Amino acid sequence: MATNTRAKIIGVGAYVPPKAYTNHDLEEMLNTSDEWIQQRTGIVKRHWVEGTTCTTDLALKAAEEALENSGIAKEELDMIIFATLSPDHDFPGNACFLQVKLDIPGIAAFDIRQQCSGFIYGLSMADSFIRSGQYKNILLVGGEIHSKGLNKTPEGRDIAVLFGDGAGAVVITATENPSESDSQFYSHNLHADGRFAKELWLSAPGTAIAPDHRITSAMLAENLHYPYMNGRTVFMHAVKRMSETLTHTLKSEGKTIDDVDLFLFHQANMRINDKVGEILGIPPEKVFNTIQDYGNTTAATIPMGMRDAVKAGKLEPGMLVGMAAFGSGFTWGSSLIRF
């Protein structure tokens, strides 16, 4: 009989910096209110780093927890995939720096930049590598530090209140000839539409906008080094695209909403997730949200939610899990796995 190689998750981990900032902590700083933030986002608090803590510091903690839960040694890994939009340095990628901190030189290591969709894209890539037979054990990390790049003044409050710092990680391994009830990845669905890239982006620094330097004093004066978001456009597209991609993935596997035990959505805005659930007819108790505790940690939201769901007893082996994300690019995608 031919061997059917699939991928599965065997370990999850997450980490956030110790210092939490509640909405009340931001009221004076940003001239806002707890009520205003909660009504528009569902966020109650977020964690921000202090001092020289960098993204791979957070990622290391998440990776160590995922490895401990996986039951395999770090030396058994043969690839690291790191999804981030906030690397420690412009280059090389964070996967290389994390490799050093884990002390596992020589294995494949690379970054992907798909912003809030990064973890879903990473799942699909890891799945493909494992199904090819070239790799057996892959560490997939989503990690971000947003707090060092936010406009923490009343002018920037619409975006500053949204984002938190954190990291999530999963260890993915090969499994042979799994039965329907065994842990495994089923399918993924990925998309992008670059026509909307400037509706949610960071224009500077970059090689496209300055003749001699990637950033200038004029750019700083115009706040081009802070992220820009067209909130209304992002909301409408996120709801539409997340609903579409999840429907497509379920249909491709002959599954329905009723078959899925738990949904893990990217945590950008509670109103987005509520609307997607309403459109698809998902019972609220099947959706596990963490945005109230962490804010939007972009590529880290889904693996962080996965870890928290396990700890809360909401996610157990054998459960069918549907995931969907939407982010800058625009990029979006979904995955269906049996945990």
Language-model regions, residue ranges each:
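Acidic-glycine-rich active-site phosphate/pyrophosphate-binding loop
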Residues: L30-Q39, H89-D103, L140-G149, D212-L220, ...
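Short glycine-rich phosphate-binding loop at a beta-alpha junction
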Residues: E75-A83, I257-H266
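Claisen-condensing/thiolase-fold acyl-transfer catalytic domains that form or cleave C-C bonds
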Residues: A2, T56, L60-A63, L67, ...
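Short beta-strand segments
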Residues: I10-G13, A83, R113, I138-E144, ...
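Condensing-enzyme catalytic core mediating Claisen C-C bond formation in acyl metabolism
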Residues: M1-G51, G156-M236, E244, F339
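Flexible, glycine-rich active-site loops centered on histidine and acidic residues
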Residues: R131-A167
